[in-house]
């Protein structure tokens, strides 16, 4: 069985907005009084400024554990200090091009259970976590890729345990899809539950045809686009 599982994401576009903050570790931390950066970077990947993808940074210090300068620190500080412009603050014409090679991580939190009122359940919401930052694109002359569909992508090894077919909902403008459920591997050598949606007919047929279940899990690789969407 393979031990090096793939978990990669790629995001490039215009710097849309951010929630980055300078924080200081508490007295009970391993390194008290250490400054670090935390927050989200939002990147808009399409010309219509509709597909906004976030990348979360939980703990970035000026130096790495090996004592070397961490390039992420200077990049994030450039954003905080306004050296790098955002769509929200400065408009799309002045916004900086940004590229981040990240990975899928998870934000775990408790929320009220719909199935069991009065109780709470643990939710693992997937998100892009960390990664090195470049202020250019992978297109010609450092510009953004011409194909917008390649500007926010993911590739993951996955253990599929369920595939559910969902019909289209015309009233809510939702397409038919196959919901792929399973487990993915993160850099901490941990596994987390995850869902992906397949909307292309060939992809739907492939995943539904696997007949995956908890008793018959299927290990494979999935890849595709990251689309932000608002469901009404």
Please give the residue ranges for each predicted region:
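OB-fold and OB-like single-stranded nucleic-acid-recognition modules
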Residues: 1-232
């Amino acid at each position: 069985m393979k031990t090096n599982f793939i978990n990669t994401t790629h995001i490039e576009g215009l710097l849309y907005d951010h929630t980055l903050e300078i924080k200081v570790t508490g007295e009970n931390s391993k390194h008290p009084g250490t400054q670090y950066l935390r927050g989200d970077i939002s990147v808009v990947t399409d010309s219509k400024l509709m597909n906004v993808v976030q990348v979360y940074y939980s703990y970035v210090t000026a130096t790495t554990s090996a004592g070397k300068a961490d390039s992420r620190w200077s990049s994030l500080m450039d954003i905080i200090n306004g050296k790098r412009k955002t769509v929200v603050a400065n408009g799309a014409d002045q916004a900086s091009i940004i590229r981040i090679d990240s990975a899928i991580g998870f934000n775990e939190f408790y929320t009220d259970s719909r199935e069991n009122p009065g109780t709470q359940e643990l939710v693992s919401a997937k998100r892009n976590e960390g990664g090195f930052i470049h202020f250019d694109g992978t297109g010609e002359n450092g510009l953004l890729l011409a194909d917008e569909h390649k500007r926010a992508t993911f590739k993951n090894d996955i253990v599929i345990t369920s595939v559910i077919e969902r019909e289209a909902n015309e009233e809510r403008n939702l397409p038919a899809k196959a919901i792929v459920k399973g487990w993915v591997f993160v850099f901490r050598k941990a596994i987390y539950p995850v869902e992906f949606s397949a909307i292309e007919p060939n992809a739907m047929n492939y995943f539904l045809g696997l007949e995956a279940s908890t008793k018959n899990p299927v290990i494979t690789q999935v890849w595709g686009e990251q689309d932000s969407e608002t469901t009404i």
